[in-house]
Amino acid sequence: MGNNSKLQNLFKHNGMTSLKSIIILMLLFLSNPMSVVCCPLSVDKTTIEIDNSNVKDLHDIINKVRSEVDDNSKVLIKFKKDRYDFYPADAQQREYYVSNHDQNQPKKVGICIEDWNNITIDGGGSDFIFHGQMLPLAIVNSSNVTLRNFSIDFENPHIAQVEIIENKGYNGMIFLVEPWVEYRINEKGYFETFEQLTMNNEQFTIDEWKYSQYTGIAFEKENRHIVYNTSDLWIDTKDVKDLGERKLYAPNWKDARLHPGTKVAMRTWNRPAPGIFLDHSNDTYINNVNVHYAEGMGLLAQRCNNIELDGFNVCLRGDDDPRYFTTQADATHFSQCKGLIRSENGLYEAMMDDAINVHGIYLKVKERIDERTLRCSYEHEQAWGFAWGDAGDSVCFVKANSMEMLEHKNVIKTICGQQTTDNGQQNSSTAGVKEFIISFEKELPEEINADVAYGIENLSWTPEVVFRNNIIRNNRARGALFSSPLRTVCEKNVFDHTSGTAILLCGDCNGWYESGAVRDLVIRKNTFINALTNMFQFTNAVISIYPEIPNIDEQTRYFHGGKHDAIVIEKNHFITFDKPLLYAKSVDGLIFRKNKVTRNNDYKPLHWNQEEILLERVKGVYK
């Protein structure tokens, strides 16, 4: 009989105390060098020590300890400082529907914490290196979880970095492929990157993934800024030729803006999984954790309550890192969360999208079933499949064409997911759901129906936000996006060459379906350095208040604001080569005061907007 069978029999004996069980458990595991070492710090606290001798058994270890401790026990999973490699073959497969990501299933999860409270994962300064396409770490349906002291990275990123060697103008481009990139010319004559992993005890290999990248971001070699006025590149590698020594000639890649020495992060728009996934969890604390690369966002949290980030970084490995990019999408993203989101002392750099985005999700009204019942749906292709609301949640309604919020508010009585299975049967499970049948406590106004496009916002799942003492630099698109009606404070941050807008307040019931009018926001004591070197969506000024409103002339109310000091922008320092500082649309209550502006000649003015402050349908402006 093996140790595991002995253990199971021992725990079947009646009358054995918890402490006695732990002592026997420790003795049995010490007799097997491949087993976890469980050290009883006290009756109610357990330490699980992980090193490279047992890391492949991590999921079994977690499950075993989870089954043997009570819900109030505090558990520490402690890694000996080292490099730990995680492979798809050893991963847990899960059907996770992740907001603002591709909904391909299943996800291959490296470290999976589900239905567990009072647990700490301490990496001890370790590197967690992932291979293939994986979701590195998931925290699901758990409370009081702490993550600290580790880094997440991938051995072979799906973004391919190259350096421009010669720009031949109309005759194409010669580029050098960086040494860590696995590449080939595929059967259609395109440059292709890939990763092969061994299968079946190394009897054969398969392509875990392969891409022919068609877009990219250009970085200056010396200072790592995104190249001025380049935005998203179009890359055509058809008929590429191998010149040897990792140099290739692409006759159809033509772009006069790319000079020799330019670093290009060649990419696709795919985003299958974030680095860290938080779902339906309460009180999550992340400290001293780095994400160096993920094929989605650095951290994605959905339907969570209270998240604290302190020293969470999406960053390069220092000034000498040969890579110029980090994550494929946002550094951090919070969808349909509540409680307090606190993000402090972070470094967010070189990602392919925003540093932080906080928002809810609009459902679209598809059918009025009766005076208290609606059929509603998720609309964006990357946001569906997960729970949207609960009985008792407060909701409001917005007319999509004008982003006019109705005075009517209601409360959910019942909400049921609706989806059709492969055999044509209706299934009310939340997983994979795109539509909901929602009944309400009060009768709905007659105007809410499918004849006019309406969205529903869940007011119960909106957070307070503190974003403080962070550095955001050298990234694509924008810096910080806030879309919550609750108190939001953005202060003492440095936005350094964010390439697009530094701060965006949006609200969109027509494209992204990201909800949240801003009612109580302070932006103060931040430094903005040379934003707007490139043009991206919604980037009308350094600070852009830009709800997506197809027909603003239909508005009778305002989307953002609602009191005289709803949005306060004060005591900031704008260091800029261009003109626009603030753009605002559909706001009631805006204060812009005591801000300092320093002009420079670092770049030529680029922006179409040459007004310092440009306002469109704004009421109650105080300077």
Predicted region positions:
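N-terminal regions of proteins, emphasizing targeting and processing segments when present
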Residues: 26-28, 40-41, 73, 203
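Extracellular parallel beta-helix/beta-solenoid repeat domains
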Residues: 45-623
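Short linear motifs centered on Gly/Pro in flexible linkers and helix caps
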Residues: 5, 9-10, 28, 40, ...
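Bacterial N-terminal signal peptides
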Residues: 20-35
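Intrinsic disorder
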Residues: 34-35, 39-42, 420-423
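N-terminal secretory signal peptides that target proteins for export/translocation
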Residues: 1-18
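Intrinsically disordered, low-complexity regions enriched for glutamine and histidine
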Residues: 6, 11, 26, 416-417, ...
